[in-house]
């Protein structure tokens, strides 16, 4: 029977007209990381204001010791230099033994695999204009710290890059970070998915000269009234904490109804550059300004940031010094925030200034202990990177000093001592250790920190690296009654937190192909 069927099938194939096709080349790349780490003091709290001891690492529900695994796999389907498609998966980070992180017995967690990127890459026919469409990484440049203080995200959007010549280029993008996430919770604010989109538009103009790079950029955003809302709290969903004031007070007659019922406007602009004409000396800088105007002064935020780096490359390493300054809150919760607003920070972004205080680890180790950005701080630092006296072994050493730029009076609102008469206060935290971006700390002008870090890398094979990181941050928080200390309110005394320093050591095995 099979032979009888095969004869007509072969005959049919013979009469099908030939179709021209081009082979698609599939390219795979990826990174495997297995890591062991041990540390303490992640929140800088030994005992909280209620006398409760903080156990474990102090953040993210982690123990002092954790073991983790993360895999990233990217598959590129390349038809030609002008056309390709890419899918980029991330599995983990899985915490060994933790069920909701996919690491418990059976390793059958269902929430640890995600699509990080999925985009189409193509050249407009007859030109060198490259267009990328879909889920992709879009980021703003920073040649000094190597990590944007404003926007670096995996996001859905379209980016277009135009190389005018060897000196001038242009990248334009539109991205939609949020849309259709609002659900009417019975308060009658608005129907589901109404006025809840966030759209951003950006321009980056890289200028490359002999020994000099200059890149001005600008980004404009429109934020729907319900994009970040939960109930009567404009920022209550948690999505907008990066552009929200740390603590704000709305007039009582504004609470319980729409504060704006319109689109808010966000704007950022910056200039970054570096000079390498006097090799081996390099000078790099970055300056950013940003603002968000919701239509209600109390909800607004605007600020700026600037940094400078000088380094000198030698045979045995590259020593450098650097500094930064970022504006801080003025102590008045009725006029919004004076810190630089931002949108997102990517876990592929690695700061050259800090390996522990901000986004700085090369692996999946603990970092961003002080915050994902440097908003509301100033500081100076020194480092030696690529320090090497032995083949395949290199080190990076850092020392940083931090001081807050926020008014000390803000601490009294945040910790619950002060209220704003005739107003209702809102916040996404209630103490110094959970008021900065994504759980970082909030430093006032009377608070200081010092960071000491060592990172060592040994190349076991061409594609396998052993990475060891050891970091320590000492915190000097003003525990007087006028800042973060204990206080009396309504006949009750609330004591100060008992503090400790933060430290962490991790060992990572990184396979990259």
Predicted regions and their residues:
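Beta-barrel outer-membrane channel/assembly domains of diderm bacteria
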Residues: 2-3, 8-134, 158-168, 172, ...
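Intrinsically disordered, low-complexity Ser/Thr- and acidic-rich flexible linkers and loops
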Residues: 52, 235-256
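Short catalytic/ligand-binding loop motif for oxyanion handling, primarily in non-cytosolic enzymes
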Residues: 95-97, 140-142, 180-181, 329-331, ...
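Internal, well-ordered domain-core segments that constitute the primary functional module
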Residues: 130-217, 222-224
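Outer-membrane beta-barrel translocator/channel fold
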Residues: 176-190, 214, 219-235, 252, ...
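A surface-exposed, glycine/aromatic-enriched loop/edge motif typical of exported proteins
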Residues: 229, 234, 327-351, 410-422
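Long, well-ordered mid-to-C-terminal structural blocks that present hydrophobic/aromatic surfaces
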Residues: 298-346, 387
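Amphipathic alpha-helical coiled-coil scaffold segments and their short linker/junction regions
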Residues: 354-364
């Amino acid at each position: 029977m099979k032979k009888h069927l095969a004869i007509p099938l072969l005959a049919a194939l013979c009469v099908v007209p030939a179709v021209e096709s081009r082979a698609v080349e599939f390219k795979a790349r990826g990174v495997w990381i297995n890591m062991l780490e041990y540390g303490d003091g992640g929140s800088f709290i030994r005992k909280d204001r209620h006398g409760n001891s903080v156990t474990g690492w102090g953040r993210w529900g982690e123990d002092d010791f954790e073991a983790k695994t993360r895999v990233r796999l990217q598959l590129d389907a390349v038809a030609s230099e002008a056309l390709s498609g890419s899918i980029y998966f991330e599995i983990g980070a899985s915490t060994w033994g933790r069920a909701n992180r996919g690491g418990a017995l059976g390793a059958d967690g269902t929430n640890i695999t995600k699509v990080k990127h999925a985009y189409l890459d193509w050249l407009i026919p007859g030109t060198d204009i490259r267009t990328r469409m879909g889920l992709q990484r879009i980021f703003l440049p920073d040649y000094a710290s190597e990590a944007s203080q404003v926007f670096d995200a995996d996001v859905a959007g379209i980016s277009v890059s135009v190389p005018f010549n060897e000196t001038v280029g242009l990248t334009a993008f539109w991205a939609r970070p949020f849309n259709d996430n609002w659900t009417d919770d019975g308060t009658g604010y608005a129907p589901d998915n109404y006025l809840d989109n966030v759209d951003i538009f950006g321009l980056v103009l890289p200028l490359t000269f002999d020994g000099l790079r200059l890149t001005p950029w600008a980004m404009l955003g429109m934020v729907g009234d319900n994009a970040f809302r939960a109930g009567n709290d404009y920022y209550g969903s948690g999505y907008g904490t990066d552009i929200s004031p740390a603590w704000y007070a709305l007039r009582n007659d504004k609470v319980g109804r729409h504060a704006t019922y319109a689109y808010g406007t966000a704007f950022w602009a910056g200039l970054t550059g570096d000079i390498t004409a006097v090799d081996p000396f390099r000078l790099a800088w970055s300056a950013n300004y940003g603002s968000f105007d919701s239509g209600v002064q109390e909800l607004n935020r605007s600020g700026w940031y600037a940094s400078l780096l000088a380094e000198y490359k030698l045979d045995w390493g590259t020593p450098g010094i650097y500094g930064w300054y970022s504006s801080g809150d003025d102590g008045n919760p009725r006029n919004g925030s004076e810190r630089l607003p931002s949108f997102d920070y990517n876990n592929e972004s690695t700061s050259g200034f800090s390996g522990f205080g901000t986004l700085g680890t090369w692996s999946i180790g603990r970092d961003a202990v002080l915050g994902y950005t440097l908003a509301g701080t100033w500081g100076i630092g020194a480092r030696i990177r690529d320090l090497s006296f032995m083949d395949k072994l290199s080190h990076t050493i850092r020392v940083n000093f931090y001081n807050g730029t926020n008014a000390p009076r803000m601490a009294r609102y945040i910790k619950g001592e002060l209220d704003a008469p005739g107003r209702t206060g809102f916040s996404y935290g209630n103490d110094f250790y959970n008021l900065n971006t994504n759980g970082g700390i909030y430093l006032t002008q009377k608070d200081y920190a010092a960071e000491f870090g060592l990172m060592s890398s040994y190349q076991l094979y061409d594609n396998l690296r052993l990475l060891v990181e050891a970091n320590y941050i000492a915190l000097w928080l003003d525990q007087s009654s006028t800042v973060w200390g204990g206080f009396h309110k309504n006949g009750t005394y609330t004591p100060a937190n008992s503090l400790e320093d933060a430290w962490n050591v991790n060992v990572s095995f990184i396979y990259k192909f």
